[in-house]
Amino acid sequence: MARYFPVQKTTMIKPEEVERKWYVVDASGKVLGRLATRIAKILMGKHKPNYTPHVDTGDYVIVVNADKVVLTGKKLDQKVYYWHSGYPGGLKSLTARQMLEKHPERLIWLAVKRMLPKNRKGRKMLKRLKVYASPEHPHQAQKPEPIEL
């Protein structure tokens, strides 16, 4: 005996149908990892009901006051960021405290970068992240919405 099961179609958004918004996030007093996960979700577009895995549906995120971000525990002195210059003996390192003093934007940028996909789509998403150490940013013309994370 055949039964009728209604078929529901999953909506798949096309790249040209994506509407992007601008959001501004104040990082002062926020924990780095928790802030970075929420920013990564917005960049990927997972906060939207029409999220489609194979299409980049994310929005733009402006982070201000990056120098006032908080790290819990002893991470300021124990967490070390490494990179290599490409030359023999060129391993460089900075602790999180030194990074926060010298390059506070890079601290948030790296945390978000490592949470995004490691492919072309992830690199494209990362270009929509704008991080500033001060409360001012040059994106007022885009009329960004303040968002509380």
From Swiss-Prot:
Q: Where are the transmembrane segments?
A: none
One GO MF term, please? structural constituent of ribosome
Q: Which Pfam families match?
A: Ribosomal_L13
Q: Name one GO cellular component term.
A: ribosome
Q: Which InterPro entries match?
A: Ribosomal_uL13 (IPR005822), Ribosomal_uL13_bac-type (IPR005823), Ribosomal_uL13_CS (IPR023563), Ribosomal_uL13_sf (IPR036899)
Q: Does the keyword Metal-binding apply?
A: no
Q: Which GO terms describe its biological process?
A: negative regulation of translation; translation
Asked if the record carries the keyword Electron transport, the reply is: no
Write down what this protein is called. Answer: Large ribosomal subunit protein uL13
Question: Whose protein is this, by species?
Answer: Thermotoga maritima (strain ATCC 43589 / DSM 3109 / JCM 10099 / NBRC 100826 / MSB8)
User: Could you read off the lineage of the organism from its UniProt record?
Assistant: Bacteria, Thermotogati, Thermotogota, Thermotogae, Thermotogales
